[in-house]
Structures are given as C-alpha cells and as structure tokens.
Amino acid sequence: KPISTTYILPSNEHVDIKDIRLMFDCFKKQNINFLEILFTKYYYLNPVYADIYQKILNNAENIAHYNNYAAVNCIAGMVFEKRAALCHPYPSLIDRIEKYGYDRKQLHHIFRCEEFLNRFISGESYANCLIPTNIEFLKEVKSNPIFISLKNAIKLADESVERVKTIKQNYMDNVAIKINSEVDTLLNDTLYDIFKLSFIKELQL
C-alpha cells in the first residue's frame, strides 16, 4: 500500500514524503507544485536508482505535457483556489489577514499562475513557463505590504479570475484533448524497474 507523510521542521516548513507510485500519479494530474520538481537543478537521487530515474528527468517536458486539459484545469484551479484564500482567515494566515486584510502571497500566486497559463497554452516550454517574466513586480506584490491596497488587491484578483475563466473556456472549446500514452508507458516501466531492483536487493540481504 502506498504510504506518504509530511514532516514539519522546527521552522514550521513542511516536507512532503511521497511514495513514488503516488508521485507519478501526481505528475499525471499535471499539478505545477509537483511537476516543477522535474525541472529544478537542485535535487538528490539515490545512486542505486539514479540510472533508472534519469529517464524521468530526461522526459520532463513530455511528462509536463501529458494531458493538456488536466494541465489547464490545474493551473486555472490554482488561481480560483488562491482567490478563495486571499482574504480568508486560515490559522496560518490570520496574522496577515488581520494586519493587511489580505494575504499578499495569495495575490502573488494569482498573478503568477495567470501568466503561466497564458504562456503554457501559447506553446512555450514548461521550463520557461516556470520562470516569470515579471519577477520584480511579483517580488513587490509578495513582500511590500503597501504596494497594493486591500481594495485594489480584491479588484485585481477578481479581474484575474474572470480572465482565467475565459482563457480556460476558450481553450476547452477550441483545442482537442491530448493524452500522451508514451508517458504512461514511461512511468509504468520506470516503476517496474525500480521495484524490481528493490526486490532483488532485499532478497540478497
């Protein structure tokens, strides 16, 4: 049975530990939060399985384009989710909400995801989409408490949501769904090879 857990560090940072089977399922759901780890330069691979897993990293773009509808739905869904959280007093956000009326980080994510969606559907590589073109603006949104007032934050967030709804609908109306079966094969074969090697090593103990 796949098992995953979350470790909470003394700094309150969260580290997700995922069973590789569940991780591959997350890749297929096309969520940016999981796919982006395929593109980072900072990672450690268990040397025992590195050669097998390298095929996954070599096919990062193909995996990130496994299902175009799932990708668009996930990116748009993140915008809607961040809008819902913008002024909501979640326990982890309540200090910011009480002080400023909204969470700047959520607004930052809304802007970032809208730009990502536009670039993704225009055909840019996933690797490029992960790097915002308006980094300085996003830094100001995220870090400067007086950069955007509460009233303007709500207005801008709502406008972004409406644009994203339109972009998503136009895409679904005019672009056919594409599912890359070769990615299914790659992920399944990689899982098989990793588990096979793991079992062989266990039997040798």
Task: Label every model-predicted segment.
Residues 188, 192-205:
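Intrinsically disordered, low-complexity terminal tails
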Residues 1-45:
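Metal-dependent nucleotidyltransferase catalytic core
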Residues 35, 129, 202-203:
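Residues in flexible loops and secondary-structure boundaries
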Residues 52-193:
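Conserved nucleotidyltransferase catalytic core and NTase-mimicking acidic/glycine-rich helix/loop elements
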